[in-house]
């Protein structure tokens, strides 16, 4: 689960992390009061969407002006103008895709007198089962570009959760950022604060880009991006309360109601599979035969008929789907339950695209019988390779 920048900063501030003062704004008429509360003389008006690259992004609407999604204002009148232009407009960035995202919230923040910009992030390193720090002197830019062009400027190290963050970790951050004296002490303190927030809130990723040194000699978090481990949200109702469903894919929201593992993709072949490994293999073989999957969908091992029907309806709700591949290897998940769910869903919503079904495992004969006697126009497949070839051929009109 992701949250907005202003929410991330408020959360980090609870752990003592230094941030600039700011006020979230949902209506243009509230911008004036927000700016006056902060005092100025310089304000930063920031679009709040779940995507990076906001500063270099462009709005679709001409009425939003030709500036990006993060704007510097030198008067309250300018703050008000930017708020009117940006709220409700569609911002396109390198991470939103061509459709962009509508800006429904702004964050008006005190301007900072910046001397240096750095990069600092924490994430879960699944290979080592530790929390990894990624640190670079190259802040304010895409860290992927830095990794590609000048990888020597990125320093990484891990913290063992059994011992937690220690003094030498903070010193490692200060050294990587080439800080000394009081700034080094600030970096050591910040390292502990960020780690404590990361662990306490069960974050999956915490990215500070940029972390700045002001001309007054203070470290400050200028932008923050936070993702949480969805499996731990039941422990954090205060985090769940921050969720903004308008920033999420409607199909993914619907899938979460049925505890389905669903991720929308950009392809045209919808997939319904049981098991994450088999789902990834199914997506790979679709790509092998020259097409792209429209989604990742794992119905899990104990799905009911109703859950399977819901999954099928979510797939068919995607207008980009031109064909559907159901690939089930029945263990705990029984093939007849899958068949009943698919038949029920098709009878309810109709079937306007080719459907290939490959069933194997528990109750496979009963599952195949249910589908064959349903009267539906379903293409059966004997194995995964056969299934992939059939759905690709059907979608291409072969």
UniProtKB/Swiss-Prot annotation:
Keyword terms, alphabetized: ATP-binding, Ligase, Magnesium, Metal-binding, Nucleotide-binding, Tricarboxylic acid cycle
Binding site for Mg(2+): 209, 223
Keyword Mitochondrion belongs to the record: no
Pathway in which the depicted protein is active: Carbohydrate metabolism; tricarboxylic acid cycle; succinate from succinyl-CoA (ligase route): step 1/1
GO cellular component: cytosol; succinate-CoA ligase complex
Single GO term (MF): succinate-CoA ligase (GDP-forming) activity
Domain ATP-grasp stretches: 9-254
Binding site for substrate: 274, 331-333
Catalytic activity: succinate + ATP + CoA = succinyl-CoA + ADP + phosphate; GTP + succinate + CoA = succinyl-CoA + GDP + phosphate
E.C. number: 6.2.1.5
Family matches, as InterPro entries: ATP-grasp, ATP-grasp_succ-CoA_synth-type, ATP_grasp_subdomain_1, SUCC_ACL_C, Succ_CoA_ligase-like_bsu, Succinyl-CoA_synth-like
Enzyme class label: ligase
Pfam families, sorted: ATP-grasp_2, Ligase_CoA
Free-text cofactor note: Binds 1 Mg(2+) ion per subunit.
Cofactor(s) named in the record: Mg(2+)
Biological process according to GO: succinyl-CoA metabolic process; tricarboxylic acid cycle
Binding-site residues for ATP, renumbered to this chain: 46, 53-55, 109, 112, 117
General function of this protein: Succinyl-CoA synthetase functions in the citric acid cycle (TCA), coupling the hydrolysis of succinyl-CoA to the synthesis of either ATP or GTP and thus represents the only step of substrate-level phosphorylation in the TCA. The beta subunit provides nucleotide specificity of the enzyme and binds the substrate succinate, while the binding sites for coenzyme A and phosphate are found in the alpha subunit.
Assembly mode: Heterotetramer of two alpha and two beta subunits.
NCBIfam families assigned: PRK00696.1, sucCoAbeta
Family: Belongs to the succinate/malate CoA ligase beta subunit family.
Name of the protein this chain belongs to: Succinate--CoA ligase [ADP-forming] subunit beta
Naturally occurring in which organism (per UniProt): Bradyrhizobium sp. (strain ORS 278)
Gene name of the encoded protein: sucC
């Amino acid at each position: 689960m992701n949250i907005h920048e202003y929410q991330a900063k408020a959360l980090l501030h609870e752990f003592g992390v230094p941030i600039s003062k700011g006020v979230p704004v949902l209506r243009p008429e509230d911008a004036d009061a927000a700016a006056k509360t902060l005092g100025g003389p310089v304000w930063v008006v920031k679009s709040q969407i779940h995507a990076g690259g906001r500063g270099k992004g462009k709005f679709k609407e001409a009425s939003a002006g030709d500036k990006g999604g993060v704007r510097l204002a030198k008067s309250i009148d300018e703050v008000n103008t930017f708020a009117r232009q940006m709220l409700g407009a569609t911002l396109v960035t390198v991470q939103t895709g061509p459709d962009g995202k509508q800006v429904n919230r702004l964050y008006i923040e005190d301007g900072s007198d910046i001397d240096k910009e750095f990069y600092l992030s924490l994430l879960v390193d699944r290979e080592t089962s530790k929390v990894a720090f990624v640190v670079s002197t190259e802040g304010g830019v895409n860290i992927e570009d830095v990794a590609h062009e000048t990888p020597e400027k990125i320093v990484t190290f891990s913290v063992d959760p059994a011992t937690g963050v220690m003094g030498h970790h903070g010193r490692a951050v200060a050294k990587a950022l080439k800080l000394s004296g009081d700034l080094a002490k600030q970096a050591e303190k910040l390292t502990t604060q960020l780690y404590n927030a990361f662990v306490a809130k069960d974050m999956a990723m915490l990215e500070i880009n940029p972390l700045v040194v002001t001309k007054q000699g203070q470290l400050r978090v200028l932008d923050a991006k936070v993702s949480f481990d969805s499996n731990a949200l039941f422990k954090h109702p205060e985090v769940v309360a921050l969720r903004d469903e308008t920033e999420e894919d409607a199909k993914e929201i619907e899938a979460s109601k049925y505890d389905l593992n669903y991720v929308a993709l950009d392809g045209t072949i919808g997939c319904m599979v049981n098991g994450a490994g088999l789902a990834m293999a199914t997506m790979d073989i679709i790509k092998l035969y020259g097409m792209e999957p429209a989604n990742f969908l794992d119905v899990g091992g104990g799905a009911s008929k109703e859950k399977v029907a819901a999954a099928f309806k979510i797939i068919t709700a995607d207008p980009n789907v031109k064909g559907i591949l159901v690939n089930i290897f029945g263990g705990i998940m029984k093939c007849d339950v899958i068949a009943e769910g698919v038949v029920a869903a098709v009878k309810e919503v109709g079937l306007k695209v080719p459907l290939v079904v490959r069933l194997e495992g528990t109750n496979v004969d009963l599952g195949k019988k249910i589908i064959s006697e349903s009267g539906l126009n379903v293409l059966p497949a004997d194995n995964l390779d056969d299934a992939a070839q059939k759905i690709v051929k059907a979608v291409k009109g072969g």
